[in-house]
Amino acid sequence: MPTKRPHAAAEFHHAFLAALRSQTEPAHVLAGVLTNKLRQQGIDGSKHFDALKRAAEQLLAAPSTAEQSSFELALDGEITSGRNVNIHLDGTDLEQTVEGITSAIETASQGIFDSLSATALQNVLKDPAARLLHLTNERDAFMRRLELTWAEPFKLLDIHVALCQEIGEVRNDWLRRQRRRAKDIAVVDVVTRLHGRTVLVAGEVQALLRNGFADGAMSRWRTMHELTVTAMLIAERGPDVAERYIAHVGADSIKAARQYQRFAAVLQHRPISARDQKRLDALAVDLERKYGKPFLNDYGWAADTLRNPNPTFASIEAAVDLDRLRPYFKLASNTVHAGAKGTFFRLGVLGDQDGILAGASNVGLQEAGRLAALSLAQITTVLLLIHPNTDSIIWSRVLGGLSSKVEQQFVKVQRRIEREERQLRKGEA
């Protein structure tokens, strides 16, 4: 285990307080005032600041209610014997001195910041293997326990994802061989691409689950659900909607270009050339002329088929009867955005525990696991039912059954964890 060192913030805190105390003690402040006053009379007291500070300490230590005080000060080469110097002090003198001290402290603070941050960085990079060894060992032990706990649902999900990927590859090859004769070439092109993306994201969900990141896995399921809903609508509504979806790449590019152009200077990026801007403007005119003004909106590709000039994902979801999953979609959205719900409620925190989750957890994996299996089965079924045959119908039913088994196993393990936690709390009570 790496040797513990004082935290850089603590080092700065102590150094800053020491500097602050030395600069703001009464004798130091008064000595600063005396230095300024002597300078006004042609005497460079800064060369003898320590002597002035001792004189200031004497003045402050001597109890007096008089408006005037005197002290003797020997400054070699500055004051001859017997010379009297009158110094008048008021609030302005103190304010000016305090301003000077404040400036000095700020300057000193920056120096301390620079020095300590450089030292801290050197310490961090000095021996990373020793520093990370303890964390790595803890992480490895956690993942072994996690794998043992969730072994069965993980295995079933692996089988499910592998099967859907295999079906996708076979189906993609078969459908594309038929595409020259098919009227729904665009549908095949879009749905196969959406299916491929969904399988890819399913792999990301698996990786997050196997590392104990329930909330991250849930956020990636949200993407799987969006892909599935989109594929369903396009497959149901046919070639025209598929062609609009493909054409909407242009609308998305126009929107992205306008946003880029707005912030290019701030980000110190090269702005879009006048030639490219003119080309994008012409594309916007062409798309609006061909598909109508609503087409340029978000989800504008679905505006015509939904008879809605400003469709949303929720309206597409409802059109394919998957709005029943909206509560889970909202739950996943909470993990993505910075809202209060997602901050105070985390899937990886069990029950009513009020902890701050800053790493992996062995609980809460069931939601993303079972929903990922469901969405993957749904979109693979969409792919299978384009030009359906006996095999595709059978495999769609197999996927439905396998998805149910995945769900059962994930829920079973989560309930066992919750039951064991209740028993543990009961024993501690």
List each model region and its residues.
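Long, hydrophobic/aromatic-enriched structural stretches that serve as scaffold segments
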Residues: 166-234
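Short, structured secondary-structure boundary patches
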Residues: 180-183, 239-241, 347
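Internal, hydrophobic cores of structured domains that mediate oligomerization or house catalytic pockets
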Residues: 216-259
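Secondary-shell segments that build the walls of catalytic and ion/ligand-binding clefts
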Residues: 1-58, 62-65, 69-76, 80-179, ...
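Alpha-helical solenoid scaffolds that mediate protein-protein interactions
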Residues: 198, 205, 224, 231-232, ...
